[in-house]
């Protein structure tokens, strides 16, 4: 519930910002909060979450583009270990499996905005400038609908490089 209220506060502030801003980048959708709640909370807690969410009048701006970075759990675990962020080291594999499945189901049916689904296992835009440039080009090409971005150099769509 803390995260839900925090997101609502952030969205309220976002709605108050300059209406003429050209670009706003966010690393979440409000719907993402519900995914985490469903995976994390037991049934009774999730029921309470749903009741509170239904009472909130959340006016989230519609995104121009949503980017879903998709990767297998093994790749996610490697990246978590490599980042070395303390609290992330305690994330359990089972939790990631459930969360990954929830994301896949959600984005399979998502129609709220243009959607770019990125095979994030095949690229490293943080450490590889060419990957960054190619991903940025794919983002700029994205106008509507749904696009699956899978770099051609990847023989196996979920291979590790």
Regions found by a protein language model. Give the residues of each.
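Short, internal active-site loops enriched in acidic
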Residues: 29-31, 71-74, 120-125
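NTP-dependent small-molecule kinase module
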Residues: 81-87, 95-161
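Hydrophobic/aromatic beta-strand patches that form the interior of the parallel beta-sheet core
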Residues: 26, 65-67, 116-118
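Generic, ordered loop/turn and secondary-structure boundary motif
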Residues: 4, 12, 36-37, 92, ...
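Residue-level marker of positions within ordered structural domains that often coincide
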Residues: 8-9, 54, 108, 123
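A glycine- and Lys/Arg-enriched "phosphate-lid" helix/loop adjacent to the NTP-binding pocket
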Residues: 33-104
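Conserved catalytic network of the ASCE P-loop NTPase/AAA+ motor domain
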Residues: 13-19, 57-62, 110
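ATP-dependent small-molecule kinase phosphotransfer cores
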Residues: 1-51
